[in-house]
Amino acid sequence: MTDSAQLFTGVHDTPVYTNVLFDKPLRIWVAVPAVVGSVTTILLAVLNLASGHALAILICGALLTAALTGIGALVPRTRPNIAFRLRAFTASVRPAVRTSYDTPILARPNLVDNLWFADNGSVYAGFLLSGLPYHLQSSRRKTAVADLHTLLGRELPADSWLYGLGVTQDQRQLLRAMVHGHRDRDDWLYSCAQVADQLADAEPKTRLYWLMVPVDAGRAGHNVVGQATKLKDWFAGRDKDSDSSLNAYIELAHDIANSLPPEFSPTPVTAAMSAWLWQHTTWLGTFTDPLPRPTAGGSITADQLPAAAFDEGDQQHKPRRPSIFNALPSWNKYVRVSATGPHSAIAPDSYQAVLPVVDAPEGGIVFPGSEFLAALDDLDTGAVFDFAINLTARPREMEFRRNDRARGNIDDQYDHRGDVRNGLTELRATERKIAEYNRLLSANIDEQPLSAAFFIHVGAADPRTLDHSIKRLREEMTQSGQIVIRHYRGANTRLWSAFNPGVAQHKSAVDQFAHATTASKWSRFVPLISSQLGNATGMLLGFNKGNANNSAVLLDLPGTARRNHNPCLICAGAPGYGKSYTSKKIVRAELQRGAQAFIVEPDEYGEWATALADVPNKAVIDMAGGDFGCDALRIFPERVAGSYWLDYMIPMLGLDVRSVAVGRLRTLLTPAARDALGLSSTAALMRYIRDIQAPLGAAEDTRSPQVTQLAEDLRPVLLALESWATYEFTQAIFDDTLPIPDLAALDVTIWQTGSLDLPDADEVANPHLYVALSDRQRASIAIYGMLVRLARVTFFNNTNRFGLIVLEEAGPLLNSRTGARDAHLISRRARKHYTGMLIITQNPIKDLALMGDEFITQQIIVPFEKEGIARAVAASAGLPLDEYPEFQDFFLAAAGAEEMRDPTAFDDDHPGPSKTTGSGSLQGRAFFIDEFRRLGAIQIAREPNEILHRAYDTTPDQGAA
């Protein structure tokens, strides 16, 4: 059965018709004035026949009856009612500036801790809620998120408010998060200071969720039961401001918070935060101060909050007209909010509009896909979009009786209305909705009937931006499930009070836009969702492109290990889209934060040496250059050096592991034998085996029988070693005069292995292919394997300093069984050894098959050129392709218009070399999977240091990527 979000709009508001007048169906507002007026007029005329005024009474009565009947015909058939519309019309025709001083619905609250004392005596408690991961998740996970909303809706007291606030991320707090734990690293502090301008240009934003629950009417809230509680307190003479009352409010708020699903992480706000909420909603779009950090206790009186003046229609700036028409109002459909009183400089004037949701599809909106409020984050118009949801729980039995009355009215209307104005169809539709509503309530005794009202608050710094934003909002709402919103002229000031908690529903007109629904159906709108990616601390990786908020994405690999998650990262994608650029940024950030890096670069290009040229404590080791040694007997600890030497050298030498020679060799390479015989290197081992061989010529052989036999057994080993020692690409193994880098003391070790040639997995797995491997390939297997194991052993032995192993162009290494085995071991054990691994690959499906990536969660995926690879990578990343066919927006490369222009347009080029990168409109874009398995598109942050940016770039003949 298809799940859906649904509002049972109008089930209790069926227009009433009657056919008492000439058996003609008329609305009650038309029939009553017509019947009463006609009868009254005729009766008065008859009674006054002798007075001489009968004709006048008849004429006036007929005119008055016609007028009242006409007015009755204008009464709206649906909510909002005539009273709301008349007040809005009056406010448009006779506008007046209303302030926080003289208008109760605009009054400022008194604040104590997380309590909000409204002007009318209502008391609310405020909590911050966490949005739940939802974007690009599977249907199963989305359903789980919606089910948590169901529990939330069932636990909230009546007349609770959920606010979704569009706020700017605190850039100062972002910088503090980046330097957290590393304030002693001057180079990292300087790097973060350079990022400040980048953050200011990006203006990252996020959505903040705020819950306000009434605590002055008991656990039930502001409904019939709650009103009875308030009446009892009134009879008892309870003082709302006493210490005992405050404690009772706080205890009730604590009880409500504990009843909510813990996934929402309800956190009590402070008085300073509540003051910020007042200012944010009052000067929406112009007040940009960040949310204050939590502080203990505190109170703020209403007089300490800035007061505001609400100019409906912005009469102060109404257009100039000829003098006779200058008294006419402006007729603008917005309100201008300005500061007044002693805090008049709090923020510039704000232009605002509040648009309620008035209708939704009758059959509901298919879930997933019903999260229409998420569309607010897709709008980038220069305005700020907030939303408010009022939830009023209704007693089940009262709701059943209410439905019965509505059903009875429908049955009656079948007789009175007939098919006037498509009446039969409308009545049947309403009857179906009531039946479905009753079915949902009856199916589950825990199902909670709700009255839900939705409001969207738009604020901007100027009217033009506001008007454009409202038009875009209407388009988004239409595309997000055919949600109908209305913009009422003259009602913005009154509707604004929906964002001032504590104002009675009939005062703020919230009751005019409430829709009957159930907790389970409301939950499918999933309003409390988040597209946040990354960590709370760490380096600036990029900006979230899952919506228009552009929120900052941080990456903290060492923190991942401390959180008991796997600090390994895969960076995959086609060449030229920024894999290496991103990896270099990550490595430099970790170096500046105190980590060590071990980089294997299978290329003679030397891009990593260029990128890290300014790092002082490093070693760049060219395996073909003869600068450093890579001998297992020298580079590994004594206790494991011999066994590791056997692991890599025996396959390279082509010896049978079950042979006598290898058995003898295994005995010689035990730690005790090596220490006794001085076998500290492969060259020393060769000298020892050579020395125990039979003397040349006629010299007397004085060897013991045991040594003679040992020499004979080891002769195949000596011959193989001497043969391999002649190659230039094996000198790192056989030349014991080459220095061994002190990896523990170095910050960076770059191993350039371009002179090596690793075979692929098939060549290693198939015996007939393996025997055909060249000596260079066999040596490459040994050297590559030793490098990866060396990094693992070195970093695993130091759990006090984070170590990062980087495998650039990791395909050749991971397609060898030895390299894949060690890389897999790192992926399983890196966490507890405080070690991370960064794998850079162009084809993760093929390159990681032998190694296995089941323990690696974090991935950065840049676009691919081939759709087949893109689809396979998307599926392996956990993106359900059947639910997100638009995956190509993230994974497939797209050329920019500049690159596909007509050749004759070359005259438009700027002088000098081309700056085109060939990566099209997706340059710098990536798909990121963080350690918590959240998925989303990001824009990789550009390196702010121009020198480093150029050093990272590998585009030929380009100054910038």
Regions found by a protein language model. Give the residues of each.
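Extended, folded cores of ATP/NTP-driven motor/assembly subunits in large transport
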Residues: A62-G70, S92-V510
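P-loop NTPase motor domains
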Residues: S139-P157, D377, W496-A552, P602, ...
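Phosphate-binding P-loop/Walker A region and its immediate neighborhood
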Residues: T281-S323, L328-N332, G341-D349, Q479-C568, ...
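Conserved P-loop NTPase motor cores
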Residues: I28, Y414-D415, S551, L557-Y577, ...
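P-loop NTPase motor core of the ASCE superfamily
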Residues: S643-A684, D847-A961
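Short, charged cytosolic
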Residues: M1-P15
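Switch/coupling segment of Walker-type NTPase motor domains
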Residues: P133, S139, D159-H182, Y190, ...
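Glycine-rich phosphate-binding loop of nucleotide-binding enzymes
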Residues: V16-I42, L132, S139-R141, A146-R154, ...
